[in-house]
Amino acid sequence: MKGFYLLLVAVAAIGGGALWYQSQRNVAPPAPSAPLPVAAADAFHGFTLGSASAPVEVTEYSDFECPFCASFATVQMPVIREQLIATGKLRWRFRDFPLPSHQYSRYAAMAAQCAGEQGKFWQMHDQLFNNHQWAQTGKNPRSLFRDFARASGLDLDKYDACMDGQRYAARLDASIQEGDALGVRGTPSFFVKGRPYTGRGTSDDFKALVDSLTKTHK
């Protein structure tokens, strides 16, 4: 474990959070011992990629409107998927943390949740981040997100019903409250073994982290 902590310190010193999007939330963080909200403790704890038996798991708190989240998703994540997730070394867990300063981030999160209902979360995730121009226009993205849903192979009638009914509002609230309880204040934020990871968040950094943790537990 000593190697793990030394690596976190070293990476933090090198990176300084280059991919960190800080936006202060208006709520004070609860005491570390405060229990998570009841709604956050249900059976759903985020969408995952990778084997459940992977030796290392990373939890990402992300905002679909966040430009640094989009950069991470389109530049770093494809390498992480190929080199770490597909090879069974890493499991990735995605949690929503739409920031209140972003007008349509919660709507985007809802679109991804509704896609997840049809088993297409990661397809919608990629559509939202790969076509991130929507986040810079300031225009209501409702029709564009519906196009993303179509491109993701969704049943549009089911998608529309889910969006109109705000079916996963409570789930999003629970994810945000869980992030608040952990002290998340910006996106993307990463947690490894329940501890915040403060490195640059590059694919090389995560590879080094996985290698270190894997060696530690051999």
Go through the PLM ranges and name each one.
Residues 39-56, 84:
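A short beta-strand-turn-helix
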